[in-house]
Amino acid sequence: MSLDFKRYLCSRINWDSSVIGIMGERGVGKTTMLLQRIKEKYANPDDTFYISLDHYWFGTHELQDLIKFMYKRGITEFYIDEVHKYKGWSTILKNLVDELQDLRIVYTGSSLLEIDNAKVDMSRRQTIYTLRGMSFREYLEYEGILKINPLAFEELLTDHVAVSMEFVPKTKILVAFDNYLHTGVYPFYKTAGKDFLVRLKEVVDTVMESDLPATEKITYDTIEKCKKLLMIIAENVPLQPNTDKLAASLGTTRDTLLKLLYKLDKAEILELLTVELKSYKKLVNPGKIYLGNTNLMYALSPGIELGTLRETFFIDQCASVGTVQMPSKGDFIVNEKYLFEVGGEDKTFDQIAGIPDSYLAIDGIETGYGARIPLWMFGLLY
């Protein structure tokens, strides 16, 4: 297990917390983070214990019994993978933390988990983090091309020219950007090689066939509808849905359709663009529906439209660090303030002329000027 490259979240976690939860999309590297932490902290790996709850061993054995058994033998820190595969996991962990002095737990789970419910049990003792797919900045480091510190959003808006001038001469940044759009979001692209897109399709299938049923009371028929829904969207991105017609085509109700859409959004397979701030507690009609990232477009969409590819990258990167909404003019509004149009080198301000805090995110350029910012630079935010 190499420590040469670590995900952005590693340095943000307060590892002193007694209970740490790391949520995230399947395939983004949660397990690798756990194993790196073990290697980094323990000279002797036998001083801690790693558990994967998707192992068949737990079909006939209890998690709490295993932890108590190892605790009595001097193990006080446990790394638990895929908690969503174990029924009643949050109550079990709460009871163990209450019962066993100085017990420490780091766990991972699907982004589909309703952690708000779990927080009722351990709200004062656990800290929850979300691991996103790799940013373009991380990809550059992972590939050994460049090492760049993350930029705050406002810093990007004001300092993008100086930042790009520092790094652009060192590499063919647009070539790297194109490679990232194809295969750079999920760290396993390195081991998957030419099979990456096939593997990514399998990841999506696993989310629908395994993770969804593990986190929701859901029938086989609903899973099949979910798959059909995803294919309809993948073939028509960005989809501007008529929810009544879309529900009818799936043979379901509008309410069920919205629940499925928001579940796929939470799983980061989709990105729902709404006029008001998105909330999983208030399911409103999305104005547009995108796939969750550009790699998913190449894996699932029969044809790639360049404008949609650009917009998908922009919304994915910006939504990782802030909020993105659908404005009345322009393409996106970020953090309820900054208005953006996304396009190629010929893009102008015509559609958003005279609007304060408006910018262009321009593809195909290495360096921008003023309010024209290179699209690739929005991949430097985390």
What are the language-model segments listed below?
Residues 1-3, 13, 20, 36, ...:
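A cross-kingdom feature that marks ATP-driven nucleic-acid transaction machinery
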Residues 26-27:
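Walker A (P-loop) phosphate-binding loop of P-loop NTPases
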Residues 30-31:
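Conserved lysine of the Walker
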Residues 45-77:
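Short glycine-rich substrate-engagement loop in P-loop NTPases that contacts/grips substrate
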Residues 71-89:
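Conserved P-loop NTPase "ATPase switch" module shared by AAA+ and STAND
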Residues 79, 104-110, 130:
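Structural recognition of the conserved hydrophobic beta-strand(s) that form the central parallel beta-sheet
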Residues 110, 116-224, 230:
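Interdomain motor-coupling "hinge/lid" segment immediately C-terminal to the ATP-binding subdomain
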Residues 188-328:
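Accessory nucleic acid-recognition modules appended to NTPase machines
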